[in-house]
């Protein structure tokens, strides 16, 4: 066969090898379809699967514009979701099959990545042998970024498109069509807007370096013009989609939210640097590296070895120097992002909680380009006649295999111990020493080993030895890190999440949007409402506004990062928000809940005893109440209660009859099994409870840490997520915790004495709010309010309410959004924002027929604009491309100046400022 013909087969061979190897991993690990193992992990189980469920439901009869499922509703446009191949593929599966379908989807994704990589390298490196063409494609496919972040399935689309974008840019520079680049970038900007900006930045930085270093001076202006035309066309086409994306995300709590692994260091550092408060914390930290970032360099030992060999040869051969300079500078810039936290943060637009180096696939791409360039241009010249090749091969094999033998067990052990994966392997210096130093050292050994292999004179033997090592290295690591094996603790855990959600969904499948379910013991994952297809408060979509989150916090619900959590709240606030049903693995208070399944199944299911109707009527004082004006949720809820025309209080602050305090020393187990002694304060408080009350506790500040709570001598079990073995010795009664940090229910008592014993790790009794909710008053309120007729159709709500006067406000338990439009008895009226972030409508005396409809204008405009903008952008690319020769040279010069300015800004903002800041603050620390 001809060599060219063989190369074309690589487009099939590389994806085929990828599919076979992944199926082998699935088979030996018992992953679906070969067992109950799963690839679900990290982001996918809490974020990905629930999103796929929601989009599937929206396209199977739900609303494309509004989501009633969680957090009392939020706008959510999924009209363009089917342009996303993930969501399109999963739309054809039953809801209960989606957790299994993603296992198949991952194989497809990896095959697509290997195909696009092999296609791009085939076109970019024409002399590259079929063997190495296949090898670099597989190196890119199973790179550290992909096997670390494969659960973020959407990211793999960008990984697949990135080689094509670079190929299309190179073809533009060779005076080929600009349309492929325009189409690829337009698709990225429209469907994956956030991720596409990593690509835009990389084009400015790395393609800019290519233009300035490698391209001839007389061709630079033409290249910049071609790049500018293609990019401009893509930006024009996707302009409204970009505007809509940032318009939506700028209103969310995630926008500007900065909390990451450096928080503890930043707090310590800031203590002596008050004069630098205006500078972001991440610029004040010195070099910051963790195992997640280093994983981006997995398999790049050969690339670094090739870079060193290119530099050595460039010293003797002048034509190679510009390529050596380009690869070296690009590699150093990526190293800056790895070690300087500020650089990584700027690449992420200022914040992230986890998943550092979201553009880490660029390291793999640069590495593959290095390897391809080396074997395409240099390897044929690189034979060195040295005797005793067997010794050289043996030493290299031992060196490289040592990295596999020594580091894989470490990674497997820690990966098994830490359910969240690599993202938390930065919290302790023990982890730093245990993982990062060996990883770095063995990486260096691998580089040395591959360089030594170059001493083999026979080209085929040294290639075979190199490929053998790479095969063992990549297959071992990918097998270890992709998927959770059948019967493993993590596979059982993740499978149980969905089984539990499906069970709850079957029980409450008939609940409408105003019959919300609550999971106070957080035994279900945060996004269980999407999996179970039932309405609830619990939400983790990153799409809630801060005011929306604050409104739930004011009602007593817990909050973690951008999550709203079911734990916390009071019987009164739940009744207001129409929490009608409760599900828990623990048995709950019979005074508040009515059992409905008699403990059958994995959960105890209850009907809430205290439920207020939809469309409850307040007096107009409710419009003047703001949560921030009250010291705690109980005073705030008392004020809301008064807007029913009540002159007394629903919540009473409880004063203890006596308090006894004692100090003690307790041993606390910390990570690694070490014991640390800490001083604790134990408080006994005695109360005389009159009438029937539910006692609630909350903390006045964030400095309180309670080790345990006992009521009348019996330890109280507080709602929280399961403890992670080996990380902490958390008592089942600790409070507050990450996912239970607002209001804690202590129990219901009637005309009796109650002894509350609280053991503090931090803080004391004066830091607590302890209130009692009068159940007789709440019951009276619920009985005097009659139900109102209502109906919900997708994103439309009809409600009939009767009021006694014209100075009333109808409260509708839906989160406020200015896009809600309302008619009252056929006439347009304003939708009011009350109680922080909920909907109110000013009522008329008598019957009120209220009709709410969520406006789709902006969402529909997004679709309508996309089509004409596509042709406008395409026209710009075609017209300017064809007329390039007659365009005045001044335009080329102007565009070149603009590009140079953008390049300089990118270098200063992304690299120079954070690097200098890191060095300066490290010196003055």
Name each model feature, range by range:
Residues 2-5, 654-925:
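Active-site-proximal, structured, solvent-exposed surfaces of multi-pass membrane proteins
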Residues 15, 111-123, 130-214, 226-247, ...:
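Membrane-embedded helix bundles of polyisoprenyl
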Residues 19-113, 138-159, 249-253, 262-291, ...:
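Membrane-interface coil-to-helix junctions
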Residues 44-54, 60, 198-201, 217-303, ...:
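Transmembrane catalytic cores of multi-pass membrane glycosyltransferases
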Residues 68-76, 470-492, 507-576, 611-612, ...:
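Extracytoplasmic/lumenal acceptor-recognition loop(s) of multi-pass membrane glycoenzymes
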Residues 75-80, 99-112, 132, 137-166, ...:
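Membrane-interface micro-motifs in multi-pass membrane enzymes
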Residues 113-121, 161-173, 205-210, 303-311, ...:
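Transmembrane alpha-helical segments
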Residues 175-179, 183, 195-197, 323-497, ...:
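Contiguous transmembrane helix-bundle modules in multi-pass membrane proteins
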């Amino acid at each position: 066969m001809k060599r060219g013909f063989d190369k074309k087969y690589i487009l099939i061979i590389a994806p085929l090898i990828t599919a076979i190897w992944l199926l082998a991993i699935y088979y030996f690990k018992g992953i679906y379809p070969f067992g109950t193992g799963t690839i679900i992990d990290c982001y996918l189980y809490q974020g990905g699967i629930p999103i796929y469920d929601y989009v599937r439901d929206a396209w199977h009869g739900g609303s494309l514009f509004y989501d009633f499922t969680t957090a009392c509703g939020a706008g959510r446009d999924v009209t363009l979701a089917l342009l996303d191949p993930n969501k399109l593929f999963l739309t054809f599966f039953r809801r209960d099959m989606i957790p299994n379908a993603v296992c198949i989807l991952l194989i497809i994704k990896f095959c697509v990545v290997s195909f696009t990589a092999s296609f791009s390298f085939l076109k970019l490196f024409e002399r590259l042998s079929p063997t190495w063409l296949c090898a670099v494609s597989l190196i890119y496919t199973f790179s550290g970024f992909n096997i670390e972040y494969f659960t973020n399935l959407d990211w793999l689309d960008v990984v697949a498109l990135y080689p094509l974008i670079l190929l299309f840019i190179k073809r533009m520079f060779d005076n080929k069509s600009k349309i492929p680049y325009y189409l690829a970038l337009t698709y990225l900007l429209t469907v994956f807007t956030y991720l596409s900006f990593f690509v835009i930045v990389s084009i400015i930085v790395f393609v800019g370096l290519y233009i300035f270093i490698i391209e001839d001076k007389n061709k630079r202006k033409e290249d910049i013009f071609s790049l500018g035309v293609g990019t401009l066309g893509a930006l024009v086409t996707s302009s409204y989609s970009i505007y809509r994306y940032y318009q939506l995300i700028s209103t969310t709590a995630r926008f500007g939210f900065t909390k990451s692994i450096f928080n503890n260091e930043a707090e310590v550092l800031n203590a002596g640097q008050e004069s630098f408060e205006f500078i972001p914390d991440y610029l004040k930290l010195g070099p910051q590296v963790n195992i997640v970032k280093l994983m981006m360099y997995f398999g790049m030992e050969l690339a670094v070895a090739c870079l060193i060999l290119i530099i050595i040869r460039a010293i003797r051969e002048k034509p190679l120097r510009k390529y050596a300079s380009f690869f070296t500078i690009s590699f150093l810039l990526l190293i800056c992002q790895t070690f300087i936290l500020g650089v990584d943060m700027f690449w992420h637009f200022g914040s992230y909680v986890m998943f550092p180096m979201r553009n880490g696939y660029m390291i793999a791409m640069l590495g593959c380009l290095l390897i391809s360039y080396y074997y395409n241009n240099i390897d044929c010249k690189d034979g060195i006649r040295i005797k005793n090749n067997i010794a050289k091969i043996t030493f290299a094999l031992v060196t490289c295999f040592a990295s596999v033998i020594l580091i894989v067990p470490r990674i497997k052990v820690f990966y098994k111990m830490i359910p969240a994966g690599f993202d938390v392997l930065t919290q302790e210096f023990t982890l730093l020493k245990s993982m990062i130093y060996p990883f770095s050292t063995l990486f260096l050994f691998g580089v040395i080993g591959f360089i030594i292999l170059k001493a083999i004179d026979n080209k085929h033997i040294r290639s075979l030895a190199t490929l053998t090592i790479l095969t063992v290295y990549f297959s071992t690591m990918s097998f270890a890190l992709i998927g959770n094996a059948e019967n493993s603790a993590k596979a059982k855990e993740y499978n149980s999440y969905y089984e539990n959600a499906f069970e709850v969904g079957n029980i409450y499948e008939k609940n409408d949007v105003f019959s919300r379910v609550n999971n106070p013991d957080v035994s279900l994952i945060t996004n269980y409402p999407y999996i179970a297809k039932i309405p609830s408060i619990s939400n983790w979509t990153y799409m809630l506004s801060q005011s929306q989150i604050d409104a739930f916090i004011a009602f007593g619900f817990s909050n973690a990062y951008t999550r709203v959590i079911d734990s916390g709240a009071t019987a009164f606030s739940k009744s207001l928000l129409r929490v009608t049903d409760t599900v828990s693995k623990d048995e709950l208070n019979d005074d508040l809940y009515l059992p409905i399944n008699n403990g059958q199944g994995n959960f105890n299911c209850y009907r809430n005893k205290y439920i207020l109707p939809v469309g409850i009527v307040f007096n107009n004082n409710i419009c003047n109440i703001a949560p921030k004006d009250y010291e705690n949720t109980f005073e705030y809820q008392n004020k809301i209660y008064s807007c029913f025309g009540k002159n007394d209080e629903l919540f009473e602050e409880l004063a203890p009859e006596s308090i006894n305090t004692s100090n003690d020393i307790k041993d606390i187990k910390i990570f690694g099994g070490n014991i640390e002694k800490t001083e604790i304060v134990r408080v006994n408080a005695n109360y005389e409870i009159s009438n029937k009350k539910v006692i609630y506790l909350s903390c006045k500040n964030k400095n309180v840490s309670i080790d345990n709570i006992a009521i009348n001598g019996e330890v109280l079990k507080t709602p929280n997520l399961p403890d992670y073995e080996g990380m902490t010795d958390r008592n089942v009664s600790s409070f507050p915790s990450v996912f239970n940090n607002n209001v804690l229910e202590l129990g219901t008592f009637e005309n009796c004495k109650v002894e509350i014993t609280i053991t503090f790790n931090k803080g004391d009794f004066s830091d607590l709010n302890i209130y009692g909710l009068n159940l007789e008053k709440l019951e009276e309120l619920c009985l005097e309010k009659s139900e109102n007729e209502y109906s919900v159709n997708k994103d439309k709500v009809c409600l009939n309410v009767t009021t006694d006067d014209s100075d009333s406000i109808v409260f509708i338990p839906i989160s406020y959004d200015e896009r809600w439009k309302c008619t009252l008895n056929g006439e347009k009226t304003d939708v009011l924002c009350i109680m922080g972030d909920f909907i109110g409508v000013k009522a008329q005396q008598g019957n009120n027929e209220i009709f709410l409809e969520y406006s789709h204008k902006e969402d529909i405009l997004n679709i309508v604009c996309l089509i004409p903008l596509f042709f406008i952008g395409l026209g710009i690319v075609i017209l300017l491309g064809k007329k390039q020769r007659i365009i005045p040279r001044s335009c080329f010069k102007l565009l070149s100046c603009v590009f140079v300015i953008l390049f300089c800004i990118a270098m200063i903002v992304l690299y120079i400022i954070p690097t200098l800041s890191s060095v300066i603050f490290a010196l003055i620390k």
